[in-house]
Amino acid sequence: MGRVFALLLCLIGVAAPAAAQGRTDAADPVTALLTRLEQLLVRGERDQFATLFDPSAAEAGIRRYETDLFLTGATKALVRERERAPLEGVPPGDGFRLVVEFFVATPGHARILTAGIDVRRPPNGNLASWRIVMLEGISSVDGLYRLRLETDRPLVAKNFRLTSEDLTVVLDEGTVFPVQTDDGVTGVVLVGRGEMQFQPAPPAERGQLRIFSGRETLNAQFETAFIRLNPSDYRAQVGALNLPAAPIDARAVRRAESVFERLAPKSFLVDLRDLSSDEWFLLPPNKDFVAEVDTRRYDTLTFTRSSAQAEDVSLFQRENKKTIALYASAAKLAARGRFYSDDAFRDYDVQDFNVDVSVQPERQVLQGRTRLALRVRSTSMSSVTLRLADALQVQSVVSVEYGPLLHLRVRGQDTVLVSLPRAVPQDSDLTLIVTYGGRLSSQDLDIDTIAVAGEPGQDSQTLFPVEPHYLLSNRTYWYPQNPVWDFATATIRVTVPDGYRAVASGEQVPPSQVIAPREGLTLQNGATFVFRSAQPLRYLALVVSRMSRVSEKTMTIESSRPGADIDKVTVAVEAQPRLQGRGRQLAPQVEEIMRFYSTLVGEAPFPTMTIALVESELPGGHSPGYFAVLNDPVPTANASWRGDPASFDGYPEFFLAHELAHQWWGQALGWKNYHEQWLSEGFAQYFAALYAQKARGDRVFGDMLKQFRRWSLSQSDQGPVHLGYRLGHIKTDLRVYRAVVYNKGAAVLHMLRRLLGDEAFFAGLRRFYDDRRFQKAGTDDLERALEAESGRTLDRFFERWIYGTDIPRIGFKSTIRDGQVTVRFTQPNDNVFDLPVTVTLTMADGKTRDVIVPLTEAEVEQVIPTETAVRRVQVNQDGAAIAEFEGS
């Protein structure tokens, strides 16, 4: 399972499955046989292993499995029967196919294995004559170690240093306590006077560090620290220093033990639960590094270098759960380049989901069974990593190809590790059926939605309670899925109590048309809703509430995309009881917006679109594929959201327009990694503005542009658009994220449109959408599409506006003469921005005329002919340029 455990860098722990309900009756001959095997393992009696096998068993196979199962010096062994089924070809009761789990440990290291074992009683044999006929498909979790803090052999430290990418941990004076394993020293506890020095290389990360600490370099004093690294890296960094032994100081020992007990379990811990009460750890891979530093000023800071990650360097504050820095090391950047996709770190593709869930919304409880059709991407795959909420207990994982499979839970990481009996080669298909259930909280609206918070210090007091709804979506991990999301078709079967309805990703179809994975899940008094998606989806979602369908209409869509297969879209509205009238009023707006966006992009992405209208204390929404949850605010006291980047006066349809735009931007077209979130949110924001112009006129559109500019100017120093969800994260101010990713992203698109012209701009967007439809996209893909349609090079444009934080300061001067106005713009030669600027001429009669001047060089001068006298010249009165202007 080598590659899988590279993912465990800072995991809280891995939990083994609960003990299987196998037979434990001592009189049971199979149990007796397994007990005998367990005794041989713990005693190390390798020479007796073959006596457990039927004479027909191949000797070579016996010796191979003997090597796998026996550990020299073993002090503990457990053999657990997990599954039992009748063995084909023998009389009933005379043979069984078993799935067995092994745990074998020495005082210092351990191994977990799972195997299929065929056992049978020979003809005319007695109960004691049962033997193993075949043992196959052993898969293992190896390399588990006990950590030993060497308090009896401390070392003297003076200017002791350990380094990793952009990090130096210096113990000026104190004591080093090695952390030992059977494979060598894998860490140290530092006690004394020290300093943590961190200086990230990327400018954007230095900016985030400045927000966190006030400086672009972190120098944090500490008295204790815990560091993990690979034994070979320890030997390379420390082995030649020949540190002298330190006298044993009882106080230093107590501090070291306290640090070790508190911080060691934070990373690489494997919690085996019923298999072992001891703590078992993995070794960090070569060059990986974890430093847990108890700083005086910032509490515990965690630095990690994790080679398995696309961005392998991070600095994290555990206490407040803040990511301070996250970026690619120089070596990683050189290997993968600036642009990357999370897909590069995906071992498999999910081709199709078949999800069957029973939901009890009042208790927030679900029972689920999901079938995943997988295709292997990596050269070979010996384990499958699934994402599933920690709150949901996995009852079984079964492969159609291999039967029941060993699975381990990664606690605190919403992860399940599934061990395969053999390595599966690239391009192979694999089908898993996962059964699970538990209590799972409804998803709150978060930074990927448009809900806005109230003003600081003002509490929302609802005059009457809202009708509840139960939302399961991309952040609840309510069904087993790939940790790196990918597009897949899906079928969702939802059973809810009487009186409730469900809306989910997909086109609703009669339940009789769908076959659930194994037997369907039901409620005693309930209704079943089925949704099927022939179009691949980024993720699956559902919402359950007391709703009624108040509107449904099928409309024709004129498509300009060659080969488009959707010419009709069914638009429906589901509304809670108090919102049914509002829902009927909403339906025509949904149709109009869908038609408008389809005209701009060239097609509709999905054949159905359902709005689930729900009560909430604040406006907002969430838009998975095929449907959107739209909040309708109830009367409140002391609630205000007007100071938010996403609050637009005079445009009540904004939230609806924004969420509907996500069906194209964010769902049909996804993003390659979190840096590219603006391709979803910035595009949805701009398309909502375009609809505002159509529905509400130029004044509302102009007000939105000015608000885009105002928030861009005030928050751009918090980080570039390309920083994605991390904007505002350190200070817990989500307005920063919305100001930069939403509003500045939309403003950038508007500047591009004015720079390239409408024809090239919208043709470029359609090309971009067509090329990346039902795929992930990056800014580089957008740039190529726009360059292809416009014939212009846009490297500098995107470098300045998406990857940079600077706001251009532009000198402006105008000269009025008879019959003409000369305008002159200047920028620094070393930091030229490409942007179109509106020059407004006010004539003597009070009329105005707007002229767009494209700025693409350090100095731009343009002569504007005039037919009447000009009284005044103004610049950027429409707020369309994100810039500061000086002069007149």
Region roles according to the model:
Residues 223, 228, 233-347, 435-550:
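Extended, low-hydrophobicity, Ser/Thr/Pro/Gly-biased non-transmembrane segments
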